[in-house]
Amino acid sequence: MANVSMRDMLKAGVHFGHQTRFWNPKMKPYIFGARNKIHIINLEKTVPMFNDALSYMQHVASNKGKILFVGTKRAAAEAVKEAAINCGQYYVNHRWLGGMLTNWKTVRQSIKRLKDLETMSQDGTFEKLTKKEALVNTREMEKLEKGLGGIKNMGGLPDVLFVIDADHEHISIKEANNLGIPVVSVVDTNSNPDGVDYIVPGNDDAIRAVQLYLNTAAEAVKEARTAQVEAKDSDDFVEATE
């Protein structure tokens, strides 16, 4: 299983929280102390909590569940997309559109429009339009792809959210809570951990820390999916030889 060690976390700067004056007292159980007015996160708490979160995501993946990676801060956006694609899952990395989960019916219509436009761009329909019409359609397609490209093949609501910054992505967490969708989230010292089912206390700004969370989660999910395929293949083999 893709576990993370304390050394990995120290190297990535996971233990550096925010300035002490910006802290959220609800994060007190996960804070080791302060240094130069910066809160230091207790990695002895973070390591097992992150590994629990990874186990849960592996459980979801091994049951063919859908995991939605959420990270819309500019610094994390590309890493979020890469990690989700790497493990065959889904992502929102541009902007969380209000109602993305709670108003799925409308989102589904927008996804259908995006797929229709993609088909039109590939089957020569755009070439039959006037330049202006083709440009309008191309721009609409690009805008929809930016907002919904990471979930266009999700085919329904996700089974779990993996969020990089609980504070920045509070709307997505609230929507997941309203629908009873479990939330795994990195929670820094300035954030509110309420509404997060699997809290990962850690730095949510340092790109090395963000990449550590994302890459480890992607590897864990891939591992679980590979094991599931291998188990199915061995079941088929047993049936064939009986």
From Swiss-Prot:
One of its GO terms (cellular component) is cytosolic small ribosomal subunit. Pfam families: Ribosomal_S2. The keyword Ribonucleoprotein applies. PROSITE patterns: RIBOSOMAL_S2_1, RIBOSOMAL_S2_2. One of its GO terms (molecular function) is structural constituent of ribosome. Belongs to the universal ribosomal protein uS2 family. This is Small ribosomal subunit protein uS2. It comes from Idiomarina loihiensis (strain ATCC BAA-735 / DSM 15497 / L2-TR).
